[in-house]
Amino acid sequence: MNRWKTSLIILMLSLTSACVMQPVVYDEARAQALESALASFRAREELTRFFDQAVAYAVFPANWRAGTGFGGAFGTGWLLEGGEVTGRALMVEAFVGANLGIQGDRKILFFRSEAALDQFKRGRFEFTGQANASVANVGKAITPGYNPDVAMFVEVRGGLMVEASVGTQRYDYFPLQESE
């Protein structure tokens, strides 16, 4: 029995570590999605000062949210430092409140300090206090200006979600591997 448990644990650890060891790939399709999202954010005049002040920013070109009272969201994005992609970020969100539907959005996080950027890159970065209200393609996402040195902006892209909820987001960072 003990040998069986040990074998099961070793098998589970091997399977999960294999998932982590996959290289992060930044290909042409992902580059185009990133450029499209960046162009959309750069076109918003109110974000100019954030682009000017940021030491880095993370762009999430396509995120999906769904909820029926309790909800969640998931998205994959890219961290840019000095205009260059340096890694991939995963976003997972949980929220609660009056919500029903599914929605697609894109978001950008601006890092105003090296300390905030380092915290993000260490992984398991959390962003709390988000409040949303949206219906179809018209929507607003309100977040505290900086948390304390991170600002987030969201563009609703589509879907139908009636929502008044509060939630927390967690981000995990994976450095970009050099291609061989």
Where do the PLM segments sit?
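C-terminal motif of bacterial Sec signal peptides marking the signal peptidase cleavage site
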Residues: 15-18
